[in-house]
Amino acid sequence: MNPIALLLLAFAMSTDAFAAAIGKGAILKKPRLTEAFRIGIIFGSIEAITPLVGWLIGKSAASYVEAWDHWIAFSLLTVLGLHMIYEGTRPDGGSEEHKAQKMSLLRTCLTAFSTSIDAMAVGVSLAFINVNIWIASALIGLATTLMVTIGIMLGRAIGSVMGHRAEIFGGLTLIAVGAWILYGQL
């Protein structure tokens, strides 16, 4: 696979993480660039690891994973999205302590993993072509880090306009990303 094709693949793999990051950025209260970059690194790291895992699986059991990957991603993103919508419709918007937990490491990692399942499937397919999986994974991780950082900051602008409804927007965004992944595989 040539370098241009690898770059296109890397940015294609980052699009669903970018969409989720816009939703995440909308619910954060004025995230700083350093916070957006930290979240980008988490997403990028997970997005870089999943093609490696997929590549290893592709060497052994590709048909089992490919049959279910889109359903897993859709389910995880829908559950996370519904929870965000629920939180956004609470009359008090939740306590300040609860708001601080919305971007907890666990929740961030779950969202990142949910949006990276397609990268795992790509890793499975990369097992069958001549590609340096280490370079491909690194490029996917770097592209995702960049796109998520941009998405968080773009979401910040959306969140300041939408106020407490930003969480509903974020939840709907996650559900839409999950539906997009599911639709693309059916």
Swiss-Prot record:
Its family? Belongs to the MntP (TC 9.B.29) family.
Q: Does the keyword Transport apply?
A: yes
- What membrane topology does the UniProt entry give? Multi-pass membrane protein
Membrane-crossing segments per the record: 3-23, 39-59, 65-85, 109-129, 133-153, 166-186
Which keywords appear in this protein's UniProt record, sorted alphabetically?
Answer: Cell inner membrane, Cell membrane, Ion transport, Manganese, Membrane, Transmembrane, Transmembrane helix, Transport
Q: What does this protein do?
A: Probably functions as a manganese efflux pump.
User: What start and end residues bound the annotated signal peptide?
Assistant: none
What Gene Ontology cellular component terms go with this record?
plasma membrane
Domain of life from the UniProt record = Bacteria
Q: What protein name does the entry list?
A: Putative manganese efflux pump MntP
**Subcellular location field:** Cell inner membrane
Q: Decide whether keyword Transferase is in the record.
A: no
A GO MF label: manganese ion transmembrane transporter activity
